[in-house]
Amino acid sequence: MASSLLAGERLVRALGPGGELEPERLPRKLRAELEAALGKKHKGGDSSSGPQRLVSFRLIRDLHQHLRERDSKLYLHELLEGSEIYLPEVVKPPRNPELVARLEKIKIQLANEEYKRITRNVTCQDTRHGGTLSDLGKQVRSLKALVITIFNFIVTVVAAFVCTYLGSQYIFTEMASRVLAALIVASVVGLAELYVMVRAMEGELGEL
């Protein structure tokens, strides 16, 4: 917090011999304090500006009060031309090494927990995707097997019908009898194939 001014050349000259404050008959204590403050040089934060003269706000208030009591024509703002508020450099306290180490440990723990959480979500998603693809593969294979079974069933029934129709020409001379015999044989073969196909499908469903 600011508590002093960087005195400008105007204030320094006013307090010197023959200066503007000489006719104002400053109290001895106030003059001594002002001269001591202006005579003491402080090193500022900026080395290029050189030594700096610091005057506390209390001395400035006392000077202002004295000028008002004397009804002086010399105003304080005129004396403070070129002066600036002095803001001391804030010195940061050293950090506690134990506290710093503890904070770093907490950061590492939080980072590890976050990494585990992210990787756990990714693993779960991969597992779900893998299970879905596996189920889809099983369904495709089952559908393929079903299509092949139906195709084999149709081919077998048609083959039984054709073979019976062609072979029955040596037994029956009429076409109607030959067709009827072929239908009977094809039906029997179809029922047998259908029975085998149903049992096979039941076995596959039991495995699923």
Swiss-Prot record:
Accessory component of the multisubunit proton-transporting vacuolar (V)-ATPase protein pump. It is a multi-pass membrane protein. Its main location: membrane. It is linked to Congenital disorder of glycosylation 2P: A form of congenital disorder of glycosylation, a genetically heterogeneous group of autosomal recessive, multisystem disorders caused by a defect in glycoprotein biosynthesis and characterized by under-glycosylated serum glycoproteins. Congenital disorders of glycosylation result in a wide variety of clinical features, such as defects in the nervous system development, psychomotor retardation, dysmorphic features, hypotonia, coagulation disorders, and immunodeficiency. The chain crosses the membrane at residues 146-166, 179-199. This is Vacuolar ATPase assembly protein VMA12. GO terms for biological process: cellular response to increased oxygen levels; intracellular iron ion homeostasis; lysosomal lumen acidification; lysosomal protein catabolic process; vacuolar proton-transporting V-type ATPase complex assembly. InterPro entries: ATPase_Vma12. One of its GO terms (cellular component) is endomembrane system. It comes from Homo sapiens. Keywords: Acetylation, Congenital disorder of glycosylation, Cytoplasmic vesicle, Disease variant, Endoplasmic reticulum, Membrane, Transmembrane, Transmembrane helix. One of its GO terms (molecular function) is oxysterol binding. Accessory component of the proton-transporting vacuolar (V)-ATPase protein pump involved in intracellular iron homeostasis. In aerobic conditions, required for intracellular iron homeostasis, thus triggering the activity of Fe(2+) prolyl hydroxylase (PHD) enzymes, and leading to HIF1A hydroxylation and subsequent proteasomal degradation. Necessary for endolysosomal acidification and lysosomal degradation. May be involved in Golgi homeostasis. Binds 20(S)-hydroxycholesterol (20(S)-OHC). The modification N-acetylalanine is found at A2. It holds the Pfam family Vma12. Coiled coil: none annotated. It is found in: Cytoplasmic vesicle, COPI-coated vesicle membrane; Endoplasmic reticulum-Golgi intermediate compartment membrane; Endoplasmic reticulum membrane.
